[in-house]
Amino acid sequence: MLWFKNLMVYRLSREVALNADEMEKQLSAFAFTPCGSQDMAKTGWVSPMGSHSESLTHAVNGQIVICARKEEKILPSPVIKQELQAKIERLEGEQHRKLKKTEKDALKDEVLHSLLPRAFSRFNQTFMWIDTVNDLIMVDAASAKRAEDTLALLRKSLGSLPVVPLTMESPIELTLTEWVRSGELPAGFIIQDEAELKAILEDGGVIRCKKQNLISDEIAVHIEAGKLVTKLAVDWQERIQLVLADDGSLKRLKFADTLREQNDDIDRDDFAQRFDADFILMTSELAALIKNTIEALGGEAQR
């Protein structure tokens, strides 16, 4: 089981019936296939259980996990530039004239087509967890763009997907700043030693603190000067450490060893049973964390 490292959280904006059996059929039409000789990139669905299953969905207790794979061909710019320049120089020498921009653009396309079959590929996978009980979708991505790209593939597969980023009633950066200023956090949360502070004005600078006592005069001076806490490392229930960000994302999730070891009594050779047990454990913990985080940040914005 791949334990999620980041959470970009989205709210289903209207009631949608998502079930694994129906999704299985819909996702299969967009299953991953490798790049052909002239493809720059390909994206599609693969089994969240890897080679242990052919199913594109895995569901337990109303929780569904799916996985998108992306293949990208790597063509370094210097290689393209070198090949293109050689072609341009050869043709200009043969024709005794300077090539027009449109001709150079056409040559660049030719160069790309000739290089693609020999290009190396880069692969990445993005897991998505759909909580049908709480109408939430979580993407294991550190950036909004990667999360949105994966949601776009799911939207294309399902035909529609009415989701919006999870937002709070109060600006998150104001809440985080007050936590650091006062040194008081809601029950269950303990401040750690890492944060990012930004000035309200765009050109006012950014301060990134690591291994720093955040409840200190030094940090208080920055807050008094108008800087806001935009990222804050916290510990939740001594079970999960994470960084809360002002965009509502939960980054760099680190599960306590005592938590991850709870299913060690299950034979690791029984992959399906261990995957099930770890998925149930992870999603139940993260669902509780998300619920507590929403409450701690002042509640979700009313739609």
Swiss-Prot record:
One Pfam family named in its UniProt record: RdgC
Species whose genome carries this gene: Serratia proteamaculans (strain 568)
Domain of life: Bacteria
Gene Ontology biological process terms from the UniProt entry: DNA recombination; regulation of DNA recombination
Gene that this sequence comes from: rdgC
Xref: InterPro entries: RdgC
Cytoplasm found in the keyword field: yes
Protein name from the UniProt record: Recombination-associated protein RdgC
Intrachain S-S bonds: none
MF (Gene Ontology): double-stranded DNA binding
Keywords, alphabetical: Cytoplasm, DNA recombination
NCBIfam families for this protein: PRK00321.1-1, PRK00321.1-3, PRK00321.1-5
